[in-house]
């Protein structure tokens, strides 16, 4: 979901209203994409996977992004509401990993959570600056966007919590998310609708409706498949040992970096 949200920010940059908008969205995109690559690198190291495999070697069905980000924003108000909900949801899950029995994972999520604090400040500022017309657009967009955000917390089984990899349970992450919705309700001057249970078939592992995937157009934007894009892409390595080392010496783990220690 961070991967997709980062591309949302990249796409929306030209629609910013001021230079601070442009710079903040560029910084937020950089954070989301950088954090995504750090997480993928961590997983590849932890499970001895080929380098870059998780970014470039998966199909659309393998991407477990939140349904909230499937549909592009129809207007500025819709974008601001969606960005608020996505940032709040991601923060609520990241906070749940702080204090994990896996120290490296805990440190990484704590750092990401701290960086996300500034994202939420930016989004709060956008909400406060909405015109009356934009506020009405945001109010119109909120019910469906909020329903999708809430559904994302339906984890199905909660093995990560049971094994103390994530100290917070799924319900605690959801409660943290709900507590943060006050700023949204205040900015839009309305009450929040009650949560409704998802009535369709739900895939708890992917946290999406059963059989669904992000739209093909969005996937093409996130990971272009054109010949030109693939030519410009760094080729996949069969293993980390296949990477070219310009200094002709083996790679060493950076002992000063705490986030990837096991």
Residue ranges: model-predicted function:
Residues 5-27, 89-106:
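Helix-loop segments that flank and shape redox-cofactor active sites
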Residues 3, 30-37, 84-88, 110, ...:
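Generic structural signal for well-ordered, non-transmembrane alpha-helical segments
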Residues 107, 119, 124-128, 132-140:
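Charged, well-structured binding/catalytic surfaces in domain cores that contact anionic ligands
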Residues 56-83, 100, 133-134, 145, ...:
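Acidic/His metal-coordination segments adjacent to aromatic residues that form catalytic metal sites
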Residues 137-262:
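Extended, helix-rich structural scaffolds rather than catalytic motifs
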Residues 68-122:
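Internal, conserved structured core segments that host functional sites
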Residues 28-57, 123-128:
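Conserved alpha-helical segments that form or flank metal/cofactor-binding pockets of metalloenzymes
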Residues 22, 26-29, 73-84, 106, ...:
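Amphipathic, non-membrane alpha-helical segments in soluble helical-bundle scaffolds
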């Amino acid at each position: 979901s961070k991967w997709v949200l980062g591309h949302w920010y990249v796409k929306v940059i030209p629609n910013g209203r001021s230079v601070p908008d442009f710079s903040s969205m560029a910084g937020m995109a950089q954070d989301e994409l950088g954090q995504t690559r750090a997480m993928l690198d961590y997983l590849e190291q932890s499970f001895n996977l080929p380098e870059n495999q998780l970014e470039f070697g998966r199909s659309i069905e393998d991407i477990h992004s939140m349904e909230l980000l499937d549909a592009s924003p129809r207007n500025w108000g819709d974008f601001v509401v969606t960005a608020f909900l996505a940032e709040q949801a991601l923060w609520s899950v990241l906070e749940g990993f702080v204090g994990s029995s896996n120290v490296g994972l805990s440190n990484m999520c704590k750092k990401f959570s701290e960086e996300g604090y500034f994202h939420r400040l930016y989004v709060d500022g956008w909400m406060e600056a909405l015109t009356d017309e934009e506020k009405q657009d945001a109010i119109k967009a909120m019910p469906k966007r909020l329903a999708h955000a809430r559904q994302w917390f339906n984890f199905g089984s909660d093995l990560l919590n049971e094994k103390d990899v994530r100290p917070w349970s799924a319900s605690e992450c959801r409660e943290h998310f709900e507590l943060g919705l006050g700023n949204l309700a205040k900015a839009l001057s309305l009450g929040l609708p009650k949560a409704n249970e998802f009535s369709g078939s739900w895939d708890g592992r992917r946290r999406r409706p059963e059989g669904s995937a992000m739209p093909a157009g969005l996937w093409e934007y996130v990971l272009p498949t054109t010949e030109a894009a693939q030519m410009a892409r760094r080729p996949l390595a069969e293993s980390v040992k296949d990477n070219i080392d310009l200094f002709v010496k083996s790679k060493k783990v950076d002992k000063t970096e705490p986030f990837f220690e096991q």
